[in-house]
Swiss-Prot record:
Gene3D superfamilies linked to this entry: 4.10.860.130, S15/NS1, RNA-binding
Cross-link (Glycyl lysine isopeptide (Lys-Gly) (interchain with G-Cter in SUMO2)): K43
N6-acetyllysine: residues carrying this PTM: K27
Coiled coil segments of this chain: none
Protein name: Small ribosomal subunit protein uS15
Post-translational modification: Ubiquitinated at Lys-27 by RNF14 and RNF25 in response to ribosome collisions (ribosome stalling).
Length: 151
């Protein structure tokens, strides 16, 4: 997928395995994987961090192939899903960091410009999540309250 605010074409991407069945060497059952997901979520890890740990430490390449559901759906069914979607959370965190940098370095014009780009991505993503009903319709990003969202 191409980059939004950069000249790169972004051609590299991960290749999913052709076979969607569970590997024969994997000894974990669906319930074991779900228990691992719940345990890691209670530690405060994000869904992507949970996926990386399951892949690297437990040999679960794709949780969806083993359990039949994605990690976020499993967390939602148990009520452990994060309030903000992960990509939106990281954009807000980045905007807070740039704004903090701008408080110390007022004349940094490039950072000011990059902050505008980051905040436009936040608004665009928030609009998408409102239409998908992930965020409530009255949710609004405000730079003054953003640091409280990511703290």
């Amino acid at each position: 997928m191409g980059r939004m605010h950069a000249p790169g074409k972004g051609l590299s991407q991960s290749a999913l395995p052709y076979r969607r069945s569970v590997p024969t060497w994997l000894k974990l059952a669906s319930d074991d994987v779900k228990e691992q997901i719940y345990k890691l979520a209670k530690k405060g890890l994000t869904p992507s961090q949970i996926g990386v740990i399951l892949r690297d430490s437990h040999g679960v390449a794709q949780v969806r192939f083993v359990t039949g559901n994605k990690i976020l759906r499993i967390l939602k069914s148990k009520g452990l899903a994060p309030d903000l979607p992960e990509d939106l959370y990281h954009l807000i965190k980045k905007a807070v960091a740039v704004r903090k940098h701008l408080e110390r370095n007022r004349k940094d014009k490039d950072a000011k410009f990059r902050l505008i780009l980051i905040e436009s991505r936040i608004h665009r993503l928030a609009r998408y999540y409102k239409t998908k009903r992930v965020l409530p319709p009255n949710w609004k990003y405000e730079s003054s309250t953003a640091s409280a969202l990511v703290a």
